[in-house]
Every structure is written in C-alpha cells, then in structure tokens.
Amino acid sequence: MVELTLATLLGTVAGDFCELRNEGRPVLESVLLAYSKANDQYGGKNVRNVISGSFGLEAQAISFVVTKCPDKL
C-alpha cells in the first residue's frame, strides 16, 4: 500500500469540496462531507496520522481549494 501524503489527502479533499460547493452545499457541510469521503477512501487512521503530523495544515488546505475552485470560499 502506498503511504498517504498530505498533498494526496488535500488534493482529494479539495476536489470533493469543490464538487459539493458546486452543488450548492454550504461550506461547513462540504468540508465535513469531503473529509468523511477521505476517511472512507484512505482509512480513518491514515487520515488522522497525516493530519496530526502536518505543519501549516490550514494554509496548505486553503491553497489547494483556492487553486481548484477559487470562487467557492
């Protein structure tokens, strides 16, 4: 199994977040659903490990979303 990286996780979550926002869902609902999908895809323990070991997570997450769908934040 390939090790989950922060870049992979954020890319997945940002893509799902943008899709959900395009459907008209609120920001918080979109974040929670995208995170939930990542847990399903990569496993909750893997997601938690990547998040807990990350530096500057908030800034990196925002930059992924702004790159993928700048009008959705």
Give a label for each model feature.
Residues 1-3, 70-71:
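N-terminal secretory-pathway/extracellular module detecting exported/lumenal segments
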Residues 2-48:
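Short N-proximal segments of mature Sec-exported proteins
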Residues 29-73:
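Compact alpha-helical subdomains of small soluble proteins
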